[in-house]
């Protein structure tokens, strides 16, 4: 991470749980153990503030040190790797993305999605900070209960975040995106659970697309088997050595034990992490955040519905879960 605040939101709690399990094992008591401050000196998050919303900067003790207010609900927040700016992207159906100074919270500018589209909550800077990529969703026809096609908008930061190129996301309803190794990984969530589009639906149409990070060409795609078609692939995390995972949410609320964490292979193939059935059921079909620890050896999933954080070794061995009320 560069200077200033690193990207985390409430993922800090995931790392605290990961450290706890790594130190004490799956049966360790859920006690606060202290969390080392990130290399950048703090965290970034989005939150409800009074009657509105804000992007906020937190120090190593999670005290708020910068607040950028917004009338629109925000979701993912991403710091520039080369300066003090950060961008918080509106939650679907997002109308704005907020550019702000993460050192003092001062709003710098706002920008809108492309014509006929909405933001879906996430964007990423390129490594040199020159471009900002946003996942956007085309608005479906009026009255249609469907999720629109996905577009990755490539934006020129110095030019005021104007769109310079548009790529297909490789699917419908993209949510998260992330550069990992030599690919730009896009989680096309398809139909999002707990939305009007999801009513009576049994399959999301979700998948993973691996794009060329320079041209946007789709190199590979990954789909779930038919028995997991109700899952929406939503959030990504990488281990720093080219390994990437994706976490899911389930359309169905039938109590079945479906895996919600998958490893993404270089050809896009998806392999489920292992866990006992009761562990999957304990997440209640919903993972709101996924993150690796700084070493890349642990990966954790937070479920606000299950009120817990589940942790695995990155190799796939399930370690256990710790309670965390409404942790996401």
Regions of interest found by a model, annotated:
Residues 68-79, 83-99, 105-125:
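Blade-loop segments of beta-propeller domains
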Residues 72-79, 118-124, 172-178, 230-235, ...:
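Repeated scaffold domains used in trafficking and secretory/extracellular systems
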């Amino acid at each position: 991470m560069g200077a200033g605040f690193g990207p985390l939101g409430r993922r800090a709690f995931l790392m605290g749980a990961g450290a706890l399990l790594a130190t004490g094992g799956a049966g360790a008591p859920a006690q606060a153990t202290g969390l080392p401050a990130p290399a950048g000196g703090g965290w970034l998050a989005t939150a409800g503030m009074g009657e509105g919303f804000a992007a906020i900067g937190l120090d190593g003790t999670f005290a708020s040190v910068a607040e950028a207010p917004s009338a629109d609900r925000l979701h993912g927040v991403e710091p520039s790797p080369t300066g003090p700016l950060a961008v918080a992207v509106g939650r679907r159906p997002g109308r704005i993305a907020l550019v702000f100074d993460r050192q003092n919270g001062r709003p710098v500018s706002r920008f809108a999605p492309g014509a006929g589209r909405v933001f879906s909550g996430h964007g990423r800077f390129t490594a040199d900070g020159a471009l900002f990529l946003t996942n956007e969703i085309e608005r479906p026809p009026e009255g249609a209960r469907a999720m629109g096609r996905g577009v990755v908008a490539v934006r020129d930061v110095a030019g005021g975040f104007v769109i310079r190129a548009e790529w297909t996301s490789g699917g419908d309803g993209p949510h998260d995106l992330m550069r990992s190794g030599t690919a730009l990984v896009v989680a096309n969530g398809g139909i999002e659970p707990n939305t009007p589009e999801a009513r009576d639906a049994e399959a999301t149409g979700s998948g993973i697309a691996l794009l060329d990070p320079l041209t946007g060409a789709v190199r590979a795609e990954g789909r779930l088997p038919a028995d997991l078609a109700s899952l929406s692939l939503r959030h990504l995390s990488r281990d720093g050595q080219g390994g990437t995972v994706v976490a899911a949410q389930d359309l169905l609320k039938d109590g079945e034990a479906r895996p919600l964490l998958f490893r993404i292979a270089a050809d896009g193939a998806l392999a489920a992490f292992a866990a006992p059935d009761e562990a999957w059921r304990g997440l209640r079909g919903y993972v709101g955040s996924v993150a690796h620890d700084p070493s890349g050896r642990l990966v954790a999933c937070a479920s606000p519905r299950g009120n817990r954080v589940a942790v695995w070794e990155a190799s796939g061995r399930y370690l256990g879960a710790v309670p965390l009320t409404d942790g996401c």
